[in-house]
Regions:
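Generic detector of short, locally flexible boundary/turn motifs and exposed helical patches
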Residues: 25, 34-39, 94-100, 133-135
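Hydrophobic alpha-helical segments, principally membrane-spanning helices and signal/leader peptides
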Residues: 7, 51, 97-99, 121
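C-terminal beta-signal and adjacent terminal beta-strands/loops
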Residues: 67, 75-94, 108-114, 118-173
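Gram-negative outer-membrane beta-barrel transporters
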Residues: 1-81
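Extracytoplasmic loops and strand-loop junctions of Gram-negative outer membrane beta-barrel proteins
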Residues: 1, 39-44, 95-103, 149-154
Length: 173
């Protein structure tokens, strides 16, 4: 293993936050960025493993009576770069593929909707927030990686997280 690569990261973010009424607010965030790597001197730059040029996040929160509020977050993100392999055999000695022809590709875009309901109240001079989060509400099977067979003739897509509900409490004193 030789750590001889050079990397470049550049980009920008736009954020708009707005309270539409006293009870309803939200924001929209858009990030445009690139993350490139040159693995060896003289080679062309290529997307780094976690290069995600486009990230869109939309958040909305509605305040209900008696300390309740509901909110949601939607994210749409460019898929991560991946190498699409064709033909070859896995070499156990170095963990690589022999005679593999790889081309640069990108996984499909990631999108997810998360919802949250929470209640805030005061208890003995302490601010208590109890919440229910549901991550990936519509259970989209976001592709995280491509897993290949030993000879690269077959592959499967490894999906990300399913629906995950969670309960929590935050205390401020």
């Amino acid at each position: 293993f030789a750590n001889q690569g050079i990397g470049q990261i550049f980009g920008g973010e736009f954020l708009l936050r707005k309270a539409l009424t006293k009870k309803f607010f939200g924001w929209v965030s858009y990030t445009l960025m690139r993350s490139l790597v040159q693995e060896k001197p003289g080679e062309a730059y290529k997307p780094f493993a976690f290069d995600q040029p486009h990230i869109l996040t939309v958040i909305a929160v509605y305040k209900l009576p008696r300390g309740w509020q509901v909110g949601g977050r939607f994210r749409l993100v460019s898929g991560n770069p991946t190498t699409l392999y064709k033909d070859g055999v896995f070499n156990n000695e170095d963990g690589g593929y022999l005679n593999a022809r790889g081309t640069q590709g990108r996984l499909p875009a990631f999108h997810q909707l998360d919802l949250r309901v929470d209640k805030t109240f005061t208890y003995k001079r302490m601010l208590v927030n109890v919440y229910l989060d549901v991550i990936n509400v519509y259970n989209h099977q976001n592709p995280e990686a491509i897993v290949y067979s030993y000879n690269l003739q077959q592959n499967t897509v490894q999906a990300g997280l399913p629906i995950i509900p969670s309960l929590g409490t935050r205390l401020e004193f």
